[in-house]
């Protein structure tokens, strides 16, 4: 699934641009970075990404995305950061123990808050919300997990900004500083 596609760029391509910069920066700082997708392959978003993450010894999981309203000329803008909200309408398929474990939920919220605040500080982007949802990738992952929506692809001005390499560097700086803040608080 290539995700959203607006103004001649696919979400998957933006995701990979930011991910590669983020991985490089984190590895330079001594972090070990694992990925569910390092090339143009399709990985099932419902359970397979979480299953892959759950088999690793990783501490946290960050899912990188770009947003879209579905409108051709959206005025929506900003960064959204999601952590898991346990909703009984969406029971866990592969993570019955950890999906609503209080420690994991608390750590996910703390990770989301740290990254969100520093993304906003680094980029100057509009705060589109620090939110909780029962997205599968957050529900099925057995460790602290966040999903980042780093800007709106269907807003022409924001689309131009999020595809700019220097702006992507600011996104990466915010994510890295957020991760560092999270670990400093442990």
Regions found by a protein language model. Name each.
Residues 1-8:
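Short glycine-rich His-centered loop
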Residues 9-186:
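Active-site-proximal helix/loop segments of hydrolytic enzymes
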């Amino acid at each position: 699934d290539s995700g959203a596609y607006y103004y001649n760029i696919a979400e998957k391509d933006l995701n990979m641009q930011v991910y590669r910069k983020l991985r490089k920066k984190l590895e330079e700082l001594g972090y070990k970075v694992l990925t569910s997708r390092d090339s143009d392959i399709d990985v099932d978003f419902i359970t397979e990404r979480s299953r892959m993450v759950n088999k690793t010894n990783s501490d946290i999981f960050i899912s990188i995305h770009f947003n879209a309203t579905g409108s051709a000329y959206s005025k929506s803008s900003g960064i959204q950061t999601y952590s898991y909200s346990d909703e009984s309408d969406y029971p866990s398929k592969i993570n019955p123990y950890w999906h609503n474990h209080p420690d994991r939920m608390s750590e996910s919220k703390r990770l989301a808050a740290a990254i969100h605040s520093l993304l906003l500080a680094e980029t100057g982007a509009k705060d589109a919300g620090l939110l909780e949802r029962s997205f599968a990738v957050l529900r099925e992952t057995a460790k602290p997990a966040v999903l980042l929506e780093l800007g709106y692809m269907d807003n022409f001005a924001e689309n131009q900004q999020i595809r700019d390499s220097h702006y992507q560097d600011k996104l990466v700086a915010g994510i890295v500083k957020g991760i560092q803040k999270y670990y400093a608080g442990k």
